[in-house]
Amino acid sequence: MSKTFIMIKPDGVKNKHVGNILARIEKEGFKILGLKYLKLSLEDAKQFYKVHSARPFYSDLCNYMSSGPIVAAALERDNAVLHWREVIGATDPKEAAAGTIRALYAESKEANAVHGSDSDENAALEVSFFFKGNELF
């Protein structure tokens, strides 16, 4: 079993897709280890996305991710990172396969409903950013 980190972004929350996305998580066989509903401060968004700090979209990304509430979750299942990436689809919803979360719920490349860790190493870092050990079950 492995872990991944997922986030329902501000557009996914605003457009009332949280229930459908959480249901999909369970349907796909993930165990929810931890779940939080919160609003990132701009500083927290900058810290979380610091890996992208040299990229031209960094400022817009941080402003967007701190613009409204999000849902953060730590999940577990076999091949968790890879499976979640398959479930959510391509970053650009125009390129996302039919039936993926982004094909169903994303508005744009930035407002694409969900985030998912891209490696086991990043999953561990991202889970620890949002959850203390006693907050995971």
Curated annotation (Swiss-Prot):
It catalyses: a 2'-deoxyribonucleoside 5'-diphosphate + ATP = a 2'-deoxyribonucleoside 5'-triphosphate + ADP; a ribonucleoside 5'-diphosphate + ATP = a ribonucleoside 5'-triphosphate + ADP. Pfam families: NDK. ATP binds at K9, F57, R85, T91, R102, N112. It is found in: Cytoplasm. It comes from the Bacteria. CDD domains: NDPk_I. Homotetramer. Major role in the synthesis of nucleoside triphosphates other than ATP. The ATP gamma phosphate is transferred to the NDP beta phosphate via a ping-pong mechanism, using a phosphorylated active-site intermediate. This is Nucleoside diphosphate kinase. It comes from Leptospira borgpetersenii serovar Hardjo-bovis (strain JB197).
